[in-house]
A protein has these predicted regions:
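Sec-dependent N-terminal signal peptides
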Residues: 4-15
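Beta-sandwich/jelly-roll carbohydrate-recognition scaffolds of carbohydrate-active enzymes
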Residues: 21-148
Length: 148
């Protein structure tokens, strides 16, 4: 009887674990601003990723980056712009946070952009796959322009 109870308990707990796996978070429209960003990161690098006005943007932070008030700061914002832009005016826009694999993908009919962080090195990877020749421009936008 004790073995049957233990077996049923393990089956129940295992079933709850399998059913309890989080699903990927999917957005079908672009964000209005950074308050609608998706978190992503690995190691000591953290990001907030979103798509605004057809540009892919992300804030970058690193553990240990504190200001004079002991607040954790973002290092700045990166803006990724593709030309011609495959996310402009498309009804097939999709931004997905892949929870089990730890990356964010932005896709449309013509392209897929993947952002992920190497957990062993402080490196952010931005991969772009498109059906047509596309140029990518990445800008760093810092709001810390003077010492405090």
């Amino acid at each position: 009887m004790k073995n049957i109870f233990t077996f049923l308990l393990l089956v129940f707990i295992g079933g709850q674990f399998l059913w309890g796996q989080p699903a990927n978070l999917v957005w079908n429209i672009q964000s209005r601003n950074a308050s609608e960003s998706m978190p992503c990161g690995g190691g000591d690098i953290g990001m907030n990723v979103w798509v605004e006005n057809d540009d892919v943007l992300f804030y970058l932070s690193r553990s240990g980056s504190f200001d004079e008030n002991n607040c954790l700061l973002k290092q700045g914002r990166f803006r990724v712009r593709l030309t011609p832009n495959p996310f402009a005016g498309t009804a097939s826009f999709r931004q997905t946070l892949h929870l089990n694999d730890g990356y964010v993908s932005v896709s449309s009919d013509n392209a897929t952009l993947i952002i992920w962080v190497d957990v062993f090195h402080p490196v952010v990877h931005v991969e772009v796959k498109t059906k047509e020749l596309t140029s990518m421009r990445v800008n760093f936008e810092s709001w810390r322009y003077e010492d405090r």
